Amino acid sequence: LKQVIFKADDFGLSPAVNGAIELAHREGVLDGASLMVGARFAADAVARAHRLPSLRIGLHLVVVAGRPVLPASVVPALVDASGEFSQRLARAGFRYFFLPAARRQLAAEIRAQFEAFRATGLPLDHLDAHHHLHLHPTVLGLLIRIGREYGLRAVRVPHEPPGLALLANEPGRWGRWLSALLLAPWIALVKYRLHRAGLRTTDRVVGLHDTGRMTATRLLKVLQTLPAGSTEIFCHPALSDAEGPWPLAVAASRAELDALLDPEVQALITNLRINHGGFCDLPHPKT
């Protein structure tokens, strides 16, 4: 049995992103999206989500490269002079691990983002994090503890297994294979902690190394080579009139939207009898 979750990140970032996510769910294969509760266009994203009750919405936790939900004066150890989280992941990770004040403020900010999500009235399908920073041990521990209070049931574990990288048979696959191999012990520990807390995860994730390149051709190849079990396939779609602080080239994000709408992709899912839905459709973890 193959179970796939097609998911988009950065819901709320811009009208072009929000519109692409709505279109990809209405007319394509997109199952869910991750909401940036502090983003400028989060309210627009929430309104769209309420019109689409079958779209599974999760929390896209932002604790780096963005703005906090709490006032900067409440979390001074987390932000720079402009009130933004650090753009430097290593620096942020160091502070979150070693500075007690940063850890206390980080806990408060994570709680505030869960509160903001709860205020939307949307069911919480899952959690992931901007730049995958929930793999950081401090962030991971806090989201498990705090998330329990807000009904958190599933978390993305961003790891593409080594074997899947080789199956891709593409340039750079050996580098992807080595990266996945080196991360495997830490990923196993992350999954153990999540499963021990009763949180669901997929068996694997696809898209981690393909940001901006999840085209229809790539998606068809992935679907044909997927092993049995559960897989999250995530992407960053946007309409061709993308605006604002969008990290991808407009053509790349439009290509990812086109992949989600592609009739061949939809036909292959049917022909291979692939089930797709949300994180909360996954079985409870075995501990």
Question: Where does each model-flagged region fall?
Answer:
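DG-centered beta-turn motif at the end of beta-strands
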Residues: A8-G12
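Terminal accessory/targeting
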Residues: L1-I5, P15-H126, P137-T287
